Each structure stands twice: as structure tokens, then as C-alpha cells.
Design a protein with these regions (language model features):
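Catalytic cores of peptidoglycan-degrading enzymes
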Residues: 19-149
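Non-catalytic extracellular/periplasmic "stalk"
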Residues: 1-26, 30
């Protein structure tokens, strides 16, 4: 392969492609302003929440390096993967972790298991995409059949 093609393939392998969850029940909360599930008013939600059974495996949506794995406040047990080129993904509310910081993961690599840790109303995966540190709507990186209402 040519060096240019190798770089292009590397970009595609590292670009987030959206979560794949067994037994998923669809999106329960979208990116953007939403009703606060814990009280009155509205709040900004910085990702997508996917309904899934407790203990379902959670996989990396792109190749990268785990930069955080542990307790992350409102996200509970969570994993952050750096995909380079300004992309990071966050996987929150996990019940158990399967990775540690510094570990390289491939797209589809096991990160942990669905839970309800942190600020959570029940078992689900909070999936966030960040571009240069700013949260962006993950739907831009998903097949529409994964989030259509």
C-alpha cells in the first residue's frame, strides 16, 4: 500500500463509528437540551444514551488508546478513548471495566460492561464524542438505524 493510502486507512480505523450493543433498546436520551431526569428544568446532555441490559458488553467504536478508565463523577465508571486527530469517545455508567489507561484498543475491542453507575436512572450506555475537547452530536458518526425514533 502507498503511504497516503496507509494514512487514510488509519484515519478510518480510528474514526468513531458508533456503538454496537447486544440487546439494545434504542436511544433513550439524545444530544442537546433535555428535561432534567432528576428534577425540574432542562439541562444540556453531551451524548446519546442507549438502553441496554445490565452487563451487556461495550465495545470501542474506533481504534485508539485508553486515556481514562475509572470513576468519572456523573458518568460513574467510564472509559475515554483517544482516537487521535482530535477525536475522543466516552463510554459511561459501566458496571465493570475491561481496560486500563494506556491500553491500545481496536475498533470492536471490549471496553467494559453496561451498568448504572454515577448519575443514572437505570442500566444504559452513555456514549459521547468529543472533537478537540468539545462535545459533538454522536449521531453524525452513527448509522441512522441506530438512533432513529
Amino acid at each position: 500500500l502507498t503511504p497516503a493510502l496507509e494514512r487514510t486507512l488509519g484515519v478510518e480505523r480510528s474514526r468513531p463509528a458508533g456503538p454496537r450493543l447486544r440487546g439494545r433498546g434504542g436511544v433513550t436520551s439524545y444530544f442537546g437540551r433535555r428535561k432534567n431526569p432528576f428534577g425540574p428544568g432542562v439541562e444540556f446532555h453531551d451524548g446519546l444514551d442507549f438502553s441496554a441490559p445490565y452487563g451487556a458488553p461495550v465495545y470501542a467504536t474506533g481504534a485508539g488508546v485508553v486515556v481514562q478508565a475509572g470513576w468519572m463523577g456523573v458518568y460513574g465508571l467510564a472509559v475515554v478513548v483517544d482516537h487521535a486527530r482530535g477525536y475522543r469517545t466516552l463510554y459511561g455508567h459501566l458496571s465493570r471495566l475491561a481496560v486500563r489507561p494506556g491500553q491500545r484498543v481496536a475498533r470492536g475491542g471490549l471496553l467494559g460492561y453496561v451498568g448504572s453507575t454515577g448519575r443514572s436512572t437505570g442500566p444504559h450506555l452513555h456514549y459521547g464524542v468529543y472533537r478537540y475537547g468539545t462535545p459533538v452530536d454522536p449521531r453524525a458518526y452513527l448509522d441512522p438505524t441506530w438512533y432513529t425514533r
